[in-house]
């Protein structure tokens, strides 16, 4: 039992004695939490007046602080969260702010430019507020207990701020990738793609069907990725939805290749690209599926114009396909991120 107790104290860093001091003092002052929360917030702004700029409801307000209608509910929310997290810290073994709320706190603090020194200000304001509320109970051990509890919550928020920062870096990387798309597509590659497309586009209807049929010859399980084929007993060539879908995909791929150098980027409209990313993510498309479509595209074009086909033309079409695939993958990554965020925001049962 004693060993378990030591393990718990080591992992949480919050002792039984600290827990008792925090609980005792919170019980003595929580009935007055409305007034204390306002005092706490006013103290923050007295210690660090520029911090006012971090709150949207205070930034451009000319109303005296105590008359601002949004201050009290916000102050109450922050003060209660801080104190109740402290009270639950040892029992729960962790900061008890709900994960989705903690994530939101991290994102908000990161967005508003909160720094480590701001957490030191809230810590000072919290300790002074509690000391003034219960001077007869205040002494160094209690101060240390509340400071430790505050730091635990601050560290949890900082961890989420770092996550928000990393996600922004990732998003910027995707944007840079998208902005640089097309820059490595040479004039020679463009000429080869345009020349070959002009030679085959009048036959694009037949080629698109051939393109799609070959996908399922190489990778039969890929059929399961398409709702209109998944549960269909109709022969592939008789499926009424196959032809328009095949035409749409084949034309988009080829026309995107033709426009790639001129536009400097994949020319699928942003909304369609976003939809493509979401659909591909939802359907479970993987990197290997893009390799299949690349192989099939190259084989289809090669068979359509064998007399023009060359290694240089193969490389040009391969590069154009990869640029489109990378743009779709970037949107799939965003869709995955949005999905994870939605899952985390759902309350656990």
UniProtKB/Swiss-Prot annotation:
Residues 13-162, 184-333 form the Globin domain. It catalyses: Fe(III)-heme b-[protein] + nitric oxide + H2O = Fe(II)-heme b-[protein] + nitrite + 2 H(+). It holds the Pfam family Globin. Its cofactor is heme b. Keywords: Cytoplasm, Heme, Iron, Metal-binding, Nucleus, Oxidoreductase, Oxygen transport, Transport. It is found in: Cytoplasm; Nucleus. Induction: Regulated by nitric oxide (NO), particularly during nodulation mediated by Sinorhizobium meliloti inoculation. Heme b 1 binds at residues 56, 70, 74, 104, 108-109. GO terms for biological process: response to nitric oxide. It is an enzyme of class 1 (oxidoreductase). InterPro entries: Globin, Globin-like_sf, Globin/Proto, Leghaemoglobin-like, Leghaemoglobin_Fe_BS. Belongs to the plant globin family. PANTHER family: LEGHEMOGLOBIN-RELATED, NON-SYMBIOTIC HEMOGLOBIN. This is Anaerobic nitrite reductase Glb1-3. It comes from Medicago truncatula. The gene is Glb1-3.
């Amino acid at each position: 039992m004693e060993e378990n107790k030591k393990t718990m104290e080591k992992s949480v860093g919050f002792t039984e004695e600290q827990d008792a001091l925090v609980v005792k003092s919170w019980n003595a002052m929580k009935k007055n939490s409305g007034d204390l929360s306002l005092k706490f917030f006013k103290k923050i702004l007295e210690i660090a007046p520029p911090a006012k700029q971090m709150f949207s409801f205070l930034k451009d307000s000319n109303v005296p602080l105590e008359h601002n209608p949004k201050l009290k509910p916000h102050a109450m929310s922050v003060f209660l969260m801080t104190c109740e997290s402290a009270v639950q810290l040892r029992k729960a073994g962790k900061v008890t702010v709900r994960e989705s709320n903690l994530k939101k706190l991290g994102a908000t603090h990161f967005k508003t430019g909160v720094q480590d020194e701001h957490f030191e200000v809230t810590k000072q304001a919290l300790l002074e507020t509690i000391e003034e509320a219960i001077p007869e109970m205040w002494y160094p051990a209690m101060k240390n207990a509340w400071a430790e509890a505050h730091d635990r919550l601050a560290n949890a928020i900082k961890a989420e701020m770092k996550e928000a920062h990393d996600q922004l870096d990732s998003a910027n990387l995707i944007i840079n990738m998208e902005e640089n798309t097309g820059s490595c597509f040479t004039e020679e590659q463009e000429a080869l793609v345009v020349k070959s497309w002009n030679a085959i586009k009048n036959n694009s209807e037949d080629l698109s069907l051939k393109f799609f049929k070959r996908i399922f010859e190489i990778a039969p399980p890929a059929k399961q990725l398409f709702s209109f084929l998944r549960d269909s007993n109709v022969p592939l060539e008789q499926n009424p939805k196959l032809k328009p879908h095949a035409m749409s995909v084949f034309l988009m791929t080829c026309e995107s290749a033709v426009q790639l150098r001129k536009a400097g980027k994949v020319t699928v409209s942003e909304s369609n690209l976003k939809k493509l990313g979401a659909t591909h993510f939802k359907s479970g498309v993987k990197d290997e599926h893009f390799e299949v479509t690349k192989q099939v595209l190259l084989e289809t074009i090669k068979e359509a114009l064998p007399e023009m086909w060359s290694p240089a033309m193969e490389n040009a079409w391969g590069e154009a396909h990869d640029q489109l695939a990378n743009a779709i993958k970037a949107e799939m990554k965003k869709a995955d991120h949005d999905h994870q965020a939605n899952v985390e925001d759902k309350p656990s049962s």
